[in-house]
Swiss-Prot record:
It comes from Streptococcus pneumoniae (strain CGSP14). Belongs to the ClpX chaperone family. ATP binds at residues 120-127. InterPro entries: AAA+_ATPase, ATP-dep_Clp_protease_ClpX, ATPase_AAA_core, Clp_ATPase_C, Clp_protease_ATP-bd_su_ClpX, ClpX_bact, P-loop_NTPase, Znf_CppX_C4. This is ATP-dependent Clp protease ATP-binding subunit ClpX. GO terms for molecular function: ATP binding; ATP hydrolysis activity; ATP-dependent protein folding chaperone; protein dimerization activity; unfolded protein binding; zinc ion binding.
Length: 410
């Protein structure tokens, strides 16, 4: 209970000793009193301790080689992209530690290096970002760029991305301000033309401009309940200068832009320049000029200086993804059936067929689970009730639908 009087006697703060006349308010507790100034001081001490805890968590950032080793446990292939991400993430958190410990007299100001990941659907963009955040034990949030609109239009404000990060950090602002945000489908909000448009582009350039502000670093007002901002709503202030933004997209068709650029160079400057090899990967040749031509505004490209290009996964890559990573799908389903005292085996030809199906559907790695679910639906429905079944074997025929999985009994 709040009071300025206690039985008409002078009341003093039990912590600082000030009287009720020297402070704005004194709160009465069980045989003790505390003034508003001591409450504010206690809050400040707690905030500082929370910041110190967050900084301590990030003071020992894994080296790039260590980060690559972690990624290799979970992500198959994409070696160049994993190296680029490991270096960028290490430098990002090293930069934060530098700014937190540097002397005021030091002139060097390390700029933030956000990341642009380009790769086809199912190549592992989201999973790479998730794995990095998990390995660093920092809050992580995913946003879909196509759901965003610029302020004043029906849709989701870009500040709601920060709300997702706050939620992932249990509303610990200091932790959230050192988290990672992955913005997917950035290519879907590309401008339709390189020419400047005089019409409003609700989900294109306008959203890019709105994203630009939080990506480059600003103090954003975040509505704690989400949705649109209201004048009466109390906002949470989030500083984005130390949040790492990883922006990704498939950029379908960008290879043609790269081919055109490389072809023009060959014609214009002779044989000493790089010729187009139809069998080579143009994804590794992407430069800022190509991304701008695709429809991303140059200001946003400038805030995404690190490019990580992911390759289309091959059948062999997908087979390895099925069985090799620490959390491989085959291991997951084997664990599920083991709870029913049933062993699960996949023939090599079955794994090949699953990978081929994913390639045909153009779903990449993200489509593997649904194919296994289709194949094993009847098994997972019936086997828990069949106590005599001890082994389930998935064959190529079971995957292509021409036969059922083989069940072996005790």
């Amino acid at each position: 209970m709040s009071t300025n009087r206690k039985n008409d006697m002078m009341v003093y703060c039990s912590f600082c000793g000030k009287s009720q006349e020297e402070v704005q308010k004194i709160i009465a507790g069980n045989n003790a009193f505390i003034c508003n100034e001591c409450v504010e001081l206690a809050q400040e001490i707690i905030r500082e301790e929370l910041v110190e805890e967050v900084l301590a968590d990030l003071s020992e950032v894994p080296k790039p080689i260590e980060l690559l080793h972690i990624l290799n446990h979970y992500v198959i292939g994409q070696d160049r992209a994993k190296r680029a991400l490991a270096v960028a993430v290490y430098n990002h958190y090293k930069r934060i530690n530098f700014h937190d410990t540097r002397e005021e007299s030091e002139d060097v100001d390390l700029q933030k290096s956000n990341i642009l990941m380009i790769g086809p659907t199912g190549s592992g963009k989201t999973f790479l970002a998730q794995t990095l955040a998990k390995s660093l034990n920092v809050p992580f949030a995913i946003a879909d760029a196509t759901a965003l609109t610029e302020a004043g239009y029906v849709g989701e404000d870009v500040e709601n991305i920060l709300l997702k990060l706050l939620q992932a950090a249990d509303f610990n602002i200091e932790r959230a301000e050192r988290g990672i945000i992955y913005v997917d489908e950035i290519d879907k909000i590309a401008k339709k033309s390189e020419n400047v448009s005089i019409t409003r582009d609700v989900s294109g350039e306008g959203v890019q401009q709105a994203l630009l502000k939080i990506i480059e670093g600003t103090v954003a007002s975040v509505p704690p309940q989400g949705g649109r901002k209201h004048p009466q709503q109390e906002m949470i202030q989030v500083d984005t200068k130390n949040i790492l933004f990883i922006v990704g997209g498939a950029f379908d068709g960008i290879e043609e832009i790269v081919k055109q650029r490389l072809g023009e160079k060959v014609i214009g400057f002779g044989q000493n320049n790089k010729a187009i090899d139809e069998n080579s990967s143009y994804m590794q040749e992407i430069i800022a000029e190509d991304i701008q031509k695709f429809g991303i505004i140059p200001e946003l490209i400038g805030r995404l200086p690190v490019f990580a290009a992911l390759e289309q996964l091959t059948v062999d890559d997908l087979v390895r993804i099925l069985k090799e990573p620490r959390n491989a799908l085959v291991k997951q389903y084997q664990t599920l059936l083991s709870y029913d005292d049933v062993e699960l085996e996949f023939d090599d030809e079955a794994l090949q067929e699953i990978a081929n199906k994913a390639i045909e559907r153009k779903t990449g790695a993200r489509g593997l689970r649904s194919i296994i679910e289709e194949t094993m639906l009847d098994v997972m429905f019936e086997v828990p009730s069949q106590e005599n079944v001890k082994l389930v074997r998935i064959t190529k025929e079971a995957v292509d639908g021409t036969d059922k999985p083989i069940l072996e009994t005790a």
